[in-house]
């Protein structure tokens, strides 16, 4: 078929008088020319310089004859011509950190196959020539943009089959400008100068002057003792030791134990406090506590019309004393205070309503909201009626045994004792300056002597004593009571009278104890007393 030649390659070698055999694979020189056209640039300015350098190299390289009108054509082989549009752009690559990053890519390639005369150079070697347009850039194009040149080689059917087999082994990550892969997220792009900072907002951040003066760092330390050696010049105060120069988290002293908000004692919190009170009856909760009050959410106040309490426990009772400075009924304002124009809610922070009127969910559900207004002021009669109701309630609690016991608070009792002791010292010389106190023994002796004097003055005749050994007649007792008191009692002060009456009551209370011990021999004593007082009658009578 080929005129005695075995293959078409041998026929072509004899036809073109070429000693070298035709090869399907790409020649090493062609591969070198292809790789030499890949440009690397760190920034746009460097890319422009390299573009001019490449133009000089292309002029000195081997050239292939082409038509004068085809300025933007690249001859790849004897029968292949590829035309590139002027709007195409080149991929810019950064070789600084061996990381390739694509800036822009807009490719519009139009392939046109044209035949040429067979009087060309060798078919096995592909000649390549770069011709660039040296004209000024069009207004549509931006200055300093690097174009992308993609070189495509079209060969025969056998060569196409070989290239397709080679392309099957090429993966997506090997191609420049391909789609993003999930494995590429681990690559760190350390490029400086390639991107513009035009998209960032021009925001000026600054540090407050107070933070600078206090010299407080925003970086938290990993351990507690890292900042142990602090400087005293810092304007901060520790809440643990009350010393300046460091914070409580860096304090070398042990942390204080939190105090209870109910009894102000340390060692327990609110939920474990022994003085914890019941939310329904407001009494301390003990082990045997029994609450007979209605549940708090079923109570409604007749005074402020709020849920959670009764009228006697309404917070308006103490709120009405906002103008009172003297003891007595609360003072009323001359003109009623109107509602302010600016109204905000403490629960939802919205404008237009108060916190007790808010319908949103409460931040703290343990208490019920109360009204901040005062609807009425109490008078003397209202205060007296409320005190009577409270006393009646206390009596009922004492009867049932539900009255709260007093909890011992050592630090409070010590302060109270000191205050009372100081008050006694200060008041004793003024109160008892004229009438100093006497001992109990001297007081008892005086009372006995006075009782003896009154008994002698009201002494009955001997006959009456005989007839009435256990006591005198009622008339005699009446005479004794009608006697005038001694002069000393008239001259005594009112204070001495009260003191004497009190001592007499104490002596009367102590006498029955002695009588109980002598009840057994009372009859014998009376018989002996009667015989002793009995005297022999005169015989003449």
UniProtKB/Swiss-Prot annotation:
It comes from Mus musculus (Mouse). Residues 116-126, 474-486 have a biased composition (Polar residues). One of its GO terms (cellular component) is nucleolus. This is Zinc finger CCHC domain-containing protein 7. The keyword Zinc-finger applies. Component of a nucleolar TRAMP-like complex, an ATP-dependent exosome regulatory complex consisting of a helicase (MTREX), an oligadenylate polymerase (TENT4B or TENT4A), and a substrate specific RNA-binding factor (ZCCHC7 or ZCCHC8). Several TRAMP-like complexes exist with specific compositions and are associated with nuclear, or nucleolar RNA exosomes. The keyword S-adenosyl-L-methionine does not apply. A zinc finger (CCHC-type) spans 236-253, 258-275, 299-316, 343-360. The lineage of its organism: Eukaryota, Metazoa, Chordata, Craniata, Vertebrata. It comes from the Eukaryota.
């Amino acid at each position: 078929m080929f005129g005695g030649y075995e293959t078409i390659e041998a026929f072509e070698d004899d036809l073109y008088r070429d000693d070298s055999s035709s090869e399907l694979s790409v020649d090493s020189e062609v591969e070198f020319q292809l790789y030499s056209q890949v440009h690397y640039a760190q920034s746009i300015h460097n890319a422009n310089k390299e573009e001019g350098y490449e133009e000089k190299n292309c002029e000195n390289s081997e050239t292939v004859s082409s038509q004068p009108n085809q300025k933007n054509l690249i001859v790849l082989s004897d029968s292949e011509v590829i035309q590139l549009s002027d709007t195409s752009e080149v991929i810019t690559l950064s070789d600084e950190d061996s990381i390739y990053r694509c800036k822009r890519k807009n490719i519009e390639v139009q392939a046109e196959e044209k035949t040429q005369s067979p009087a060309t150079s060798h078919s096995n070697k592909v000649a390549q020539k770069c011709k660039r347009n040296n004209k000024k850039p069009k207004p549509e194009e931006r200055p300093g943009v690097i174009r992308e040149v993609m070189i495509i080689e079209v060969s025969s059917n056998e060569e196409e089959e070989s290239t397709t087999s080679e392309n099957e082994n090429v993966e997506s990550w090997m191609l420049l400008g391909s789609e993003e892969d999930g494995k590429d997220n681990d690559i760190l792009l350390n490029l400086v100068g390639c991107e513009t900072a035009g998209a960032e907002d021009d925001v000026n951040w600054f540090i407050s002057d107070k933070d600078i003066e206090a010299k407080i760092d925003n970086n938290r330390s990993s351990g507690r003792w890292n900042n142990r050696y602090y400087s005293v010049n810092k304007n901060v105060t520790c809440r643990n030791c009350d010393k300046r120069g460091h914070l409580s988290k860096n304090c070398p002293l042990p942390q204080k134990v939190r105090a209870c908000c109910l009894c102000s004692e340390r060692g327990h919190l609110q939920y474990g406090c022994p003085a914890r009170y019941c939310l329904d009856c407001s009494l301390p909760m003990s082990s045997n506590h029994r609450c007979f009050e209605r549940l708090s959410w079923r109570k409604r106040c007749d005074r402020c019309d709020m849920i959670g309490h009764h009228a006697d426990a309404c917070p308006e009772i103490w709120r009405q004393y906002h103008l009172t400075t003297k003891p007595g009924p609360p003072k009323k304002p001359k003109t009623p205070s109107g509602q302010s124009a600016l109204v905000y809610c403490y629960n939802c922070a919205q404008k237009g309503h108060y916190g007790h009127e808010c319908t949103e969910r409460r931040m703290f559900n343990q208490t019920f909201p109360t009204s901040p207004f005062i609807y009425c002021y109490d008078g003397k009669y209202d205060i007296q009626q409320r005190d009577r109701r409270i006393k009646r309630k206390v009596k009922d609690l004492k009867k049932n045994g539900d009255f709260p016991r007093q909890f011992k608070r050592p630090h409070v009792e010590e302060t109270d004792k000191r205050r009372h002791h100081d008050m006694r010292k200060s008041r004793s010389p003024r109160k008892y300056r004229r009438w100093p106190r006497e001992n109990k023994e001297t007081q008892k002796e005086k009372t006995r002597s006075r009782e003896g004097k009154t008994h002698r003055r009201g002494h009955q005749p001997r006959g009456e004593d005989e007839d009435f050994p256990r006591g005198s007649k009622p008339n005699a007792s009446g005479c004794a009571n009608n006697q005038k008191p001694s002069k000393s009692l008239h001259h005594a002060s009112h204070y001495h009278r009260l003191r004497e009456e009190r001592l007499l009551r104490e002596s009367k209370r102590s006498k029955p104890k002695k009588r109980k011990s002598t009840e057994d021999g009372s009859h014998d004593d009376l018989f002996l007393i009667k015989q002793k007082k009995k005297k022999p009658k005169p015989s003449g009578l």
